[in-house]
């Protein structure tokens, strides 16, 4: 456990982690402070962060299980202590850590008698189990037991109809919530006109993310949410009173991408795969899920098409432009490639 003394500041807005501990493999705790804040700001930040932490953080979970020759979820299987419903509930509690996108397959295939734990799940390389000792079932007889699983990344709590499908699979109410709980408290400091507030934020996670990682992701999601309001230029808004104030240039992705499309003559865009563009794994996975495999596929998409891709964010959009700007004028034109 790490502890630090809280040092109040009346100058620059700062945050720090004042306490961090691991209570168990599936319970991490972190305590953070943000100060100095003007009166009312701590409540604004605290409410926004709490909602973002509980509802906007993505998590990986088991979403479906397929048993062989099981008529319904309340059935019992000979040689297994638990019913199918109990096994599904145990699978629901398995905590996974991964950056995967889309649906992945996993499985369990063991021979009894023995206890089945999370360690027995055969996972794709990109997924790992936080607590391998989590129980799944107890085989009391020498039987072969196999389950096919589906793993997906999502956010929030997804409830599905409790029915078995024709292929014998059962949906699991997916809990894609790495953050278990969030509390915040506000303390006032100073006297008179120098009075300010300190925000204390407590975060508990399930071990798939640390509280610090969760806080970072929630903050990024909030920033992405408010970015459209910064595009005053696109709305034709002018602020005369701010003309002498430095403002970072707005990201005009659509205009730049249009210019690239106009100048793509002589470049074999269908022969250039996005694997060659040095994209981040997050951006690359988003494009792959949308069946964008080549530079021609990418330049054929509008800005609106890209923003409709699941989990695609504005920072991904900027990263794509920076990468295209880096590669197209230098690498491709220099080599004089043509269709």
UniProtKB/Swiss-Prot annotation:
GO CC, any one term: chloroplast
Domain of life: Eukaryota
Region (Alpha C-terminal domain (alpha-CTD)): 264-339
Keywords: Chloroplast, DNA-directed RNA polymerase, Nucleotidyltransferase, Plastid, Transcription, Transferase
GO biological process, one term: DNA-templated transcription
Enzyme class, spelled out: transferase
Pfam families noted in UniProt: RNA_pol_A_bac, RNA_pol_A_CTD, RNA_pol_L
Gene3D superfamilies linked to this entry: 5' to 3' exonuclease, C-terminal subdomain, DNA-directed RNA polymerase, insert domain, RNA polymerase, RBP11-like subunit
The EC number(s) this enzyme carries: 2.7.7.6
Annotated SUPFAM superfamilies: C-terminal domain of RNA polymerase alpha subunit, Insert subdomain of RNA polymerase alpha subunit, RBP11-like subunits of RNA polymerase
Leader sequence segment: none
InterPro entries reported in the protein's UniProt record: DNA-dir_RNA_pol_insert, DNA-dir_RNA_pol_RpoA/D/Rpb3, DNA-dir_RpoA, RBP11-like, RNAP_asu_C, RNApol_insert_sf
MF GO annotations: DNA binding; DNA-directed RNA polymerase activity; protein dimerization activity
Reactions this protein catalyses: RNA(n) + a ribonucleoside 5'-triphosphate = RNA(n+1) + diphosphate
Region (Alpha N-terminal domain (alpha-NTD)): 1-233
Localization per record: Plastid, Chloroplast
Function description: DNA-dependent RNA polymerase catalyzes the transcription of DNA into RNA using the four ribonucleoside triphosphates as substrates.
Complex formation: In plastids the minimal PEP RNA polymerase catalytic core is composed of four subunits: alpha, beta, beta', and beta''. When a (nuclear-encoded) sigma factor is associated with the core the holoenzyme is formed, which can initiate transcription.
Family in the record: Belongs to the RNA polymerase alpha chain family.
Domain commentary: The N-terminal domain is essential for RNAP assembly and basal transcription, whereas the C-terminal domain is involved in interaction with transcriptional regulators and with upstream promoter elements.
Annotated protein name in UniProt: DNA-directed RNA polymerase subunit alpha
The species this protein was found in: Bromus inermis (Smooth brome grass)
Origin organism lineage: Eukaryota, Viridiplantae, Streptophyta, Embryophyta, Tracheophyta
Gene: rpoA
């Amino acid at each position: 456990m790490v502890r630090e003394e809280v040092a109040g500041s009346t100058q620059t807005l700062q945050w720090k982690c004042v306490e961090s501990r691991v209570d168990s493999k599936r319970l991490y705790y972190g305590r953070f402070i943000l100060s100095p804040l003007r009166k009312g700001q701590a409540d604004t930040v605290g409410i926004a962060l709490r909602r973002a932490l509980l509802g906007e953080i993505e998590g990986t979970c088991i979403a479906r299980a397929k048993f062989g020759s099981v008529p319904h979820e309340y059935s019992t299987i000979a040689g297994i202590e638990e019913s199918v419903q109990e096994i599904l509930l145990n699978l629901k509690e398995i905590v996974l850590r991964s950056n995967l996108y889309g649906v992945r397959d996993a499985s369990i295939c063991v021979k009894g008698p023995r206890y089945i734990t999370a360690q027995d799940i055969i996972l794709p390389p990109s997924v790992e189990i936080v607590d391998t000792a989590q129980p799944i079932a107890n085989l009391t007889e020498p039987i072969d037991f196999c389950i096919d699983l589906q793993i997906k990344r999502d956010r929030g709590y997804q409830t599905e109809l409790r029915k078995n499908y024709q292929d014998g699979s059962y949906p699991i109410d997916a809990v894609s919530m790495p953050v278990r709980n969030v509390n915040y408290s506000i303390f006032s400091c100073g006297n008179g006109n120098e009075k300010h507030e300190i925000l204390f934020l407590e975060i508990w996670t399930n071990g798939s993310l640390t509280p610090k990682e969760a806080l970072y992701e929630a903050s990024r999601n909030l920033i992405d949410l408010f970015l459209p309001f910064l595009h005053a230029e696109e709305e034709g808004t002018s602020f005369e009173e701010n003309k002498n104030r430095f403002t970072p240039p707005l990201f005009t992705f659509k205009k730049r991408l249009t210019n690239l499309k106009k100048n793509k003559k002589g470049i074999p865009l269908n022969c250039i795969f996005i694997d060659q563009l040095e994209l981040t794994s997050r951006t690359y996975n988003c494009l792959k899920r949308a069946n964008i495999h080549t530079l021609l596929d990418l330049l054929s998409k509008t800005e609106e098409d890209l923003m409709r891709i699941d989990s695609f964010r504005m920072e991904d959009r900027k990263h794509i432009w920076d990468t295209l700007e880096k590669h197209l004028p230098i690498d491709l034109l220099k080599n004089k490639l043509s269709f």
